[in-house]
Curated annotation (Swiss-Prot):
Organism: Pseudomonas fluorescens biotype B
Key word Protease present: no
GO molecular function, one term: copper ion binding
Protein name as annotated: Azurin
Upper taxonomic lineage: Bacteria, Pseudomonadati, Pseudomonadota, Gammaproteobacteria, Pseudomonadales
Ranges of residues in domain Plastocyanin-like: 1-128
Length: 128
């Protein structure tokens, strides 16, 4: 099983995929986030946050006031399953999930919590 994937983010406020598929055979799963744009992180920064789909917008809303130094995530937010830091052009960061903590019956998703980005930068996370 391929237990990792790389997702690129751009200056056009987009990820290069709308879906992450995780093989149930994986013990852990790693997502590397890259940024192929040219803008710095304070202008067009992106992170990748994984949570239950129902929690995505509330996490992003609560994270607005946290600021860029806290990656636009509320400190100690237990709804966040995993997240990268906010990166800018040419940077990369990764996250690793314990696959055993995911429930096949639950709907998961990924998104960018940078202010205003979730509307365009989100997708599904599926166990298969």
């Amino acid at each position: 099983a391929e237990c990792k994937t790389t997702i690129d983010s751009t200056d056009q406020m987009s990820f290069n995929t709308k879906a992450i598929e995780i093989d149930k055979a994986c013990k852990t799963f790693t997502v590397e986030l890259t940024h192929s744009g040219s803008l710095p992180k304070n202008v067009m920064g992106h992170n990748l946050v994984i949570s239950k789909q129902a929690d995505m917008q509330p996490i992003a809303t609560d994270g607005l006031s946290a600021g860029i130094d806290k990656n636009y995530l509320k400190e100690g937010d237990t709804r966040v399953i995993a997240h990268t830091k906010v990166i800018g052009a040419g940077e990369k960061d990764s996250l690793t999930i314990d696959v055993s903590k995911l429930n096949a019956a639950e709907k998961y998703g990924f998104f960018c919590s940078f202010p205003g980005h979730i509307s365009m930068m989100k997708g599904t996370v599926t166990l298969k």
